[in-house]
């Protein structure tokens, strides 16, 4: 089975904890001396879920007790569509949002990721509801919005996994016949984020490039390949000489620039998606002109956990909040 659900009566003591504990027992993950489960049941598993109707939580087979989460939104359904007579339960929301057949198949194909931990363990990651909803809305805009309205700002609070949301968008594009010829440019402002983004997007079958210099970035933007480029924001304006000086002082976030070069028009295609991480930072507003000029017809989506008016002014209205 793709999904294993443990259902508990809501009136027993701690039904959610008992349901999760039983899921762990079925998988032989409780550390018992003798085998107590049937791990073969989970060989093809994508989601495990514990529910007692009023509370419902899910995780992957590698998740610990603390990793079980609520699916709090049934998007694209409205809550009133699920239960017209009142507020739907957590179980009803999760079933409509995750387990409706087309949603579940979409999640399995486009929203499951894997991460290698430093300990050597491979962790299976399942999406959170805001990641699924945000990626879904971005894809819908790419497909259906008029020119000039396809981009915008995605406001998800800190810690909600915006990097994974970007990866889910890319994977869904790759698996969509009408979107898999896009070029994707991912822009970050820290080296650790650039490395994280590169590792994360390697799970997608696009060719992945890191822009190592301003000239390298220009060449990657110019080419017509449907690929993914990961670039630091300073590549859109700072001279390499000044960047080298500051790298000796600081290897993390950017410092204030002293020299900004002007980019020419590099690619006029309208099949370019630019996704910008932490787009509320001042660097993006200062260098936005070069982004716009180098790819004048591209779709630009800003990801932020701290929205400010200037972000919306630069990148467009809210796609999801």
Task: Please name every model-derived segment.
Residues 16-19, 23-30, 61, 69, ...:
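Signature of the SF2 helicase/ATPase Hel1-core->accessory helical subdomain module
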Residues 35-37, 212-217, 260-262, 285-289:
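Short beta-alpha junctions and helix-cap segments that line functional grooves
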Residues 39-40, 178, 220, 263-266, ...:
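A general structural signal for stabilizing positions within well-ordered secondary structure
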Residues 91, 119, 185, 209, ...:
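Short, functionally important structural connectors and interaction interfaces within domains
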Residues 191, 211-219, 233-238:
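Conserved helicase motor
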Residues 205-212, 275-281:
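Short, charged, low-hydrophobicity "junction" segments
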Residues 216-229, 266:
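Conserved motor-coupling elements within RecA-like helicase/translocase cores
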